[in-house]
């Protein structure tokens, strides 16, 4: 991709390195830009910007271990992965959590997971 992305997701994180590593692994994304305040991740499907919450705000945020899914969040992004089974392992190995069952969908199967800070996302595996 050349030039700025036309579409993407910006996500705030208390622990920039931890959250970035989660999405790098689960989405197979690579870091295309990094500085102390944010990381820009790129996969074939999406650009994800992980932005560090300012320290004075982050100090008041408590993140559970394992993470507590934020079921009341207003938006849940979805991402397509090659294999839900592989993604599930990656989620658990990078501090995330599996949330709920796998559901069949038209031409796909889907699963909810949360990242290490409790942000819910929807993973999709398309039918071969």
What do these predicted regions represent?
Residues 1-7, 29-80, 86-114, 125-128:
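Vicinal oxygen chelate
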Residues 10-12:
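A conserved hydrophobic helix/loop-capping motif in glycosyltransferases and polysaccharide synthases
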Residues 19-24, 91, 118:
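Conserved active-site tyrosine of GNAT-family acetyltransferases
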Residues 120-123:
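Short glycine-/small-residue motifs
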């Amino acid at each position: 991709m050349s030039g700025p992305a036309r579409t993407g997701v910006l996500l705030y994180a208390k622990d920039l390195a931890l959250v970035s590593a989660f999405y790098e692994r689960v989405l197979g994304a690579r870091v295309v830009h990094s500085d102390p305040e944010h990381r820009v991740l790129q996969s074939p499907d999406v650009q994800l910007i992980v932005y560090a919450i300012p320290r004075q705000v982050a100090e008041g945020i408590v993140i559970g271990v394992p993470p507590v899914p934020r079921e009341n969040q207003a938006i849940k992004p979805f991402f397509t992965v090659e294999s839900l089974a592989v993604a599930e392992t990656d989620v658990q190995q990078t501090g995330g959590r599996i949330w709920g069952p796998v559901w069949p969908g038209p031409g796909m199967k889907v699963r909810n997971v949360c990242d290490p800070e409790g942000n819910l996302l929807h993973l999709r595996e398309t039918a071969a």
